[in-house]
Each structure stands twice: as C-alpha cells, then as structure tokens.
Amino acid sequence: VAVKKIMKPFSTPVLAKRTYRELKLLKHLKHENVISLSDIFISPLEDIYFVTELLGTDLHRLLTSRPLEKQFIQYFLYQIMRGLKYVHSAGVVHRDLKPSNILVNENCDLKICDFGLARIQDPQMTGYVSTRYYRAPEIMLTWQKYDVEVDIWSAGCIFAEMLEGKPLFPGKDHVNQFSIITELLGTPPDDVINTIASENTLRFVKS
C-alpha cells in the first residue's frame, strides 16, 4: 500500500476544506483509472493518513527518465481519458491534472490521484487551481465560469508532453504562460475576449 500524509489539515479552514473534499471524493469514486482509498487514520498530532493502493511511480518520473514509445503513449492517454470520463460523469472537475498526479505501475496500469483541488461542478469556480504548465487559459484569465473542459486542456498538455518529452507550455509566470499559448494557438476571438470580467486582464489580452 501507499500512505499519503497530510500534516495539520485542521490548522486552517482552507486546508480543512481541501482535506475533507478529497476524502469525500475518494470515498465515492470507484474506477479502474482512479486511485482508490482503502483506509484513513488520524495520528495523536492530528495529522491525517490516507491509505491507498501502491503503483510505484508516476508519469512525471517516466517522462523525465526516458522517451515513451508510441504504444505506451496511446495506452496512457486512453486510460487518462477513460478516468476523466468517469470523474466528469460523477459531476467532478479535477482541476489539477498533471503528470505527477497520474500514477503508473509496472503493468502500465494508470490511475488519476490527488483530488485535493477537485470540485463538484459549479457555475462559479475559483481561479487558483492547477499547476501553471497545464492550466487552461480561462483559468489564467480569471474566468470563474468554467467546467470539465479545463481537465481536457490539461490532458491535451500531458499528451503533447508525452509526444515531445517536454512541457508544451513551460511558462515562467502567468503572463509568459499566456504569451506562449497565444504564440502557438493564436489570440482568442473577440467574442471570447469580451467575456473576460477583469478589466486589467482584458487590457492585457488586447495588448
């Protein structure tokens, strides 16, 4: 088994909510491509331990150790999308999908993990989610109305990284990240830009 330690999860309201959210989701999500929770216990110091299945490594370690052959890329992508389909059908948005949150075992079985930032689908979402390289533009542009498409964007970034062996959008900060995306994909159309609520962000995009 694997044990995930969460130190002092009750020390702040944010940590407490995040821990409760992850525990609640892991308790109910049951799928071949989603990590399963086998047990949980609290230490005398009030640290929480999640006991899960052990897979051995993660996709980030694989990508930094060697190039992936085509058949492995296909199989990994299939399992990622299969897991996401299940998670999304349960009304959940992961919001922090990245190679280090995708576990792999010696048989190339893959499981999505770390649901600490996941949320039940809601018309209003917070923008502070997801590691920068895999963050969808609508999150960077401070949109609060987004849905499962942010996970699909992250999956696309991971797919490109598996093909190229390096991150597709390795931004140094939010501004540089958005610039790299628009250089490759172009500027969003006006009807999309005009939905941006923040005036500062709107001026930046139009510039």
Curated annotation (Swiss-Prot):
The keyword Phosphoprotein applies. Residues 1-207 form the Protein kinase domain. GO terms for molecular function: ATP binding; MAP kinase activity; protein serine kinase activity. Dually phosphorylated on Thr-126 and Tyr-128, which activates the enzyme. The active site is at D96. The modification Phosphothreonine is found at T126. It catalyses: L-seryl-[protein] + ATP = O-phospho-L-seryl-[protein] + ADP + H(+); L-threonyl-[protein] + ATP = O-phospho-L-threonyl-[protein] + ADP + H(+). It is found in: Cytoplasm; Nucleus. The modification Phosphotyrosine is found at Y128. Keywords: Activator, ATP-binding, Cytoplasm, Kinase, Nucleotide-binding, Nucleus, Phosphoprotein, Serine/threonine-protein kinase, Transcription, Transcription regulation, Transferase. GO terms for cellular component: cytoplasm; nucleus. The keyword Transferase applies. It comes from the Eukaryota. The TXY motif contains the threonine and tyrosine residues whose phosphorylation activates the MAP kinases. Proline-directed serine/threonine-protein kinase involved in a signal transduction pathway that is activated by changes in the osmolarity of the extracellular environment. Controls osmotic regulation of transcription of target genes. This is Mitogen-activated protein kinase HOG1.
